[in-house]
Structures are given as C-alpha cells and as structure tokens.
Amino acid sequence: DHPLLGSKLEKRDSTSSINMFDIAGETQWIGEISIGTPPQKMLVQFDTGSANVIIAPDAYKPSQSNSSFKAKDQFKTGYGDGTKVEGNVYVDNFELGGIKARNLSFGLTNENFLQDFERESSGIGGLSFPSISNFDSKYLTLIEALMQQKSLKQNVFQFTLKPGEGSTLIFGDIDHSKFNGDLTWVKVNPLFGFYIADAKINGKKIRTAVDSGTTVIIGSRSQVKDLVERTNGVHYAEDRSTNIGYGLFDCDFSPEVTITYGGTDFKLNRDQVSRGTANGKCLLSVIGIDSILPFDTW
C-alpha cells in the first residue's frame, strides 16, 4: 500500500468555487479538476448519485505524474443509465478550485465509458457518502476525505446550475447571493449512501434521492401515473418498448408541479416543468421507471 494512503489532508479550512458549464443540451454540467504532480487538468461531471471519482483512460497519464501510485485493487461500478465500467484504483494529489488535497483515491477505467454527447467530459466526480463506494473501505472517497480531514471551512457544497454561463460548485461555504429567500434544511442518513430525504410532490409524500447527475425527476411508474392523473391538463402514457411512463400536455399550458422539502414549497417554473416535445405535445419532466432505486425512492 501507498505509505501515505489515508493520511490527513493539509488543514486549510478553505473554500473553493469551480466554474461549471452545461453540455448536451443542458442535461449535464461539468467543471475542472486537476490530478497529479504536475497537475493534469480535466473536466468531470460532479455527481451526488455516486461516491467515487472515475476517470477515463485518455484523461490521466500515471507516467506523467511523479505523485501517482497504482494500487493493487481493481474496481467495478455501474450507473443508473446502464453504463458499467471497470479498471484500477489509483492514488494521487487532487486540486478542486483552490483546494489542494493529497493522496485521494480514484478509478482509472480500462476503456472509455463516456457517450458521444459527453465527449467534453473526462469522468465522474462522485460526491455521495462512502457507504455506496465501489472501492475498499481503506480508500477515502472525496467527500469522506474532505469531511474527516477538516479541509473545508464548513462541510458543505453548493451547486448553482443554469443554462450558459454562471453555474458554479462551491466547496466549504454557502454563497447566499446565489438564491432568494432562506435555506431549507432536511435530514439525510449517511448510511443510505445517497442524499435521501423525505419530500412531497403535489402534496403526496415521497422519498427522494437528490442526484445532480440526473436530468429529470424519476419515480416508479405507478407513482408517476398517480401524479399525472392528479395533475390538471396532463395525461399519462407509456412507451411499451422501454417501460417508461410519462406525462403529456398542450405546450401552451403550464401544469402545476410543486415539490416540498422541509415544509418549503418549490414550484417548477415553465422551463423546468417540461423536457422537450413528442407528437406535438410537451413532455412532463417527471418520468416513471421501475427498479432504479429501492423502496420506491424518487
């Protein structure tokens, strides 16, 4: 094992802000990180739905970093879109905005796993809890390291995502200028791995996993069908070839969809409530897919 594996990060109590931009028609946001000495820069998708940093093989060259260490362990992992990857665990120095972190583990895949529309990205930056890590527990995940080793001013991160310019990911602090009103806090259990929180959608109680790597709102087909049938102006349909349920509505109409967290209502605006069109109708940005997460989690 690497002699510094699991060693503490240099204590800085720091904050950093990473500029992000959207790709693939506002379906994903990517930002820059650096790995190695000297640093090798790359763009990754920061994902609260996975725990590990996974990098494509053409983005990182171990031979070009004098701080790189190839561990003995292999890894296998998969994502909700069906992508499956495998490769080798490495340990090296990271930089996230202004924060420098030493000896963090990541996976270097054997083959490129990113799709054509993701070609600007070099990998996945997992931000969830370590209980869903696909690495041995001796390897600290990014979030685990930043929290346990007191690298940040506060153990928080903040996404601000929008079309075009102005999107950011802040580590270690909260920028109140990025939003209106007060913050709403909800409890999550780290043992679940995902950021799972109780919520309501149009008044009905649901359990949700907040996932920055997912473009639309996803629930089970039965629950989405129930939601659509209770929402004025929207009718339910299913694609039998994919077993996906969805809602359709006239594009000159704006259905009301409200998500409630911690007693605070968040009403989807006109741009948020629809994700494209089909046969002259607008598609509701809530779809039904079974077997994505357990316990009917949205």
Go through each PLM region and give its residues.
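Non-catalytic N-lobe/flap surface of aspartyl protease domains
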Residues: 1-184, 225-260, 283-298
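N-terminal acidic, glycine/proline-rich low-complexity segments
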Residues: 7-11, 185-187, 209, 262, ...
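Flexible, glycine-rich surface segments
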Residues: 191-234, 239-242, 246
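Structural motif
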Residues: 35-37, 96, 196, 201-202, ...
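Flexible, small-/acidic-enriched active-site or ligand-binding loops
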Residues: 168-205, 275-282
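Extended low-complexity, serine/threonine- and proline-enriched intrinsically disordered segments
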Residues: 260-261, 266
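Edge beta-strands of extracellular beta-sandwich domains
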Residues: 268-272
